[in-house]
Amino acid sequence: MTKRALISVSNKDGILEFAKELVALGYEILSTGGTKKMLQDNAVAVTAVDEVTKFPEILDGRVKTLNPMIHGGLLGKFDDDSHQAQMNEHGIEPIEIVCVNLYPFVETISKPNVTWDDAIENIDIGGPTMLRSAAKNHQYVTVIVDSNDYATVLEELKAGGATTIETRRKLAAKVFRHTAAYDSYISNYLTEEEFPESLTMTYELKQNLRYGENPHQKAAFYQKRLGSDFSLAYATQLHGKELSYNNIQDGNAALQIVKEFEMPAAVAVKHMNPCGVGTGVTLEEAFDKAYEADPTSIFGGIIALNMEVDAATAEKLSHIFLEIIIAPAFSQEALDILTKKKNIRLLTIPFEQAKQDQFNVVSVEGGLLVQEPDRYGFANADIKVVTDREPTKQEWEALQLGWSVVKHVKSNAIVVTDSQMTLGVGAGQMNRVGAAKIAFEQAGEKAKGAALASDAFFPMSDTVEAAAAAGITAIIQPGGSIKDQDSIDKANEYGITMIFTGVRHFKH
């Protein structure tokens, strides 16, 4: 009996050569629609599916292969006498190979002006059904959903007349991953609930990593197919070694901070916390400020810049050991300077597409925590000056800078700033005064006349007391403590201006 292969693909890459090889190996090709026409136009003998089903395509092609003559051939066990008897009774012949890929639903909904009707018409029904039938029966049927697998299948067919059970099992598993992902894109597109009763997310493997956070941990990097282009997952690497797990974590943290600024800005990150943030009239000035903020911790750090890197900035960057530099672009002169450093990684990301994902997702043992990103910045805050003294223009600028940075620092967080740069960062402390002391120690004499930003309210007035001792003259914090008045009174006592925002910025 002639072996049969059913081919129906929307992605025609490599399919003509694959079909010709199957014919040469003695397979009869079954096909439908555009695939059938393409094969026939290229002199490949094809049997139309409706010749097998004895039923025409109907409903504008919505029903083609949904027929027992097809699915019986896919699901029947080749070595089961009962199955074979039933197939013979109904004139059903087995199908040994299925090669199907699906309507381009994701590509369709990615178009800027896609209509609802276009999206719905690109939901494939017959394709996933055939794939699942063939994958279920992989003991006997070879199912292919990825053109990268054509060569492996042909190699095994030529060598032994059939594919191995190991290959068929791997291909079947790939099919079920593929159809599950396909369905998740559809369900997410159709879902209107913010937090539905079940949550299905699809990520595709971008790369295997050398190791995870530590050398004994295995790791890989997955990306969203419909994710934001403003992401390391879609960055273009111009130079350097492949990214590590920690590089990706730190790079992502740097990106989230630098996109807070419209003026030229530079952000240095170590262990997912900023060690230096600087702004300026030029990018070179912004980097100078970020470096000045903490010239020790920046060593081995990640730098994110929000403007094209020019030669002057690149020259200064080249004198420091840095893991990664991320920017919208690099001038040719800057590339010539920086690529002399063998190991530094240079990445570009389209800043004009800077946006956040719909949700932040955190894995916990046995589940996921899902929340909206913290999108509230200075412009969203309900600013209230709660002290007798109003901030000066320079203090307002320093407070705004501090508030833009502190939301990205691990809680409890205190950030000390002037109008252009961070002066001290107290991160991840179990009490607020402890975080403040770290920030003051780092700022040193520069804390005098500077501003302080706190990610959460002061439970008592001791942080204001410590700020006054360090020389701080302006404070920004959410407010909301039952002892707010104590902090206000203490600020007034020392002539400190203080504003409440009404917004907390915990970060764990």
Swiss-Prot record:
Pathway(s) annotated for this protein in UniProt: Purine metabolism; IMP biosynthesis via de novo pathway; 5-formamido-1-(5-phospho-D-ribosyl)imidazole-4-carboxamide from 5-amino-1-(5-phospho-D-ribosyl)imidazole-4-carboxamide (10-formyl THF route): step 1/1; Purine metabolism; IMP biosynthesis via de novo pathway; IMP from 5-formamido-1-(5-phospho-D-ribosyl)imidazole-4-carboxamide: step 1/1
GO (cellular component) term, any one: cytosol
CDD domains named among the record's database cross-references: IMPCH
Domain named MGS-like: residues: 1-145
Any one GO molecular-function label of the UniProt entry: phosphoribosylaminoimidazolecarboxamide formyltransferase activity
Listed PANTHER family: BIFUNCTIONAL PURINE BIOSYNTHESIS PROTEIN ATIC, BIFUNCTIONAL PURINE BIOSYNTHESIS PROTEIN PURH
NCBIfam families recorded: PRK00881.1, purH
Listed Gene3D superfamilies: 3.40.140.20, Methylglyoxal synthase-like domain
Source organism (scientific name): Lysinibacillus sphaericus (strain C3-41)
Record SMART domains: AICARFT_IMPCHas, MGS
InterPro entries membership: AICAR_Tfase_dup_dom_sf, Cytidine_deaminase-like, MGS-like_dom, MGS-like_dom_sf, PurH-like
Protein's UniProt name: Bifunctional purine biosynthesis protein PurH
Biological process annotations from GO: 'de novo' IMP biosynthetic process
Domain notes: The IMP cyclohydrolase activity resides in the N-terminal region.
Entry similarity comment: Belongs to the PurH family.
Catalytic reaction(s) noted: (6R)-10-formyltetrahydrofolate + 5-amino-1-(5-phospho-beta-D-ribosyl)imidazole-4-carboxamide = 5-formamido-1-(5-phospho-D-ribosyl)imidazole-4-carboxamide + (6S)-5,6,7,8-tetrahydrofolate; IMP + H2O = 5-formamido-1-(5-phospho-D-ribosyl)imidazole-4-carboxamide
Record has Transport as a keyword: no
Keywords: Hydrolase, Multifunctional enzyme, Purine biosynthesis, Transferase
HAMAP family: PurH
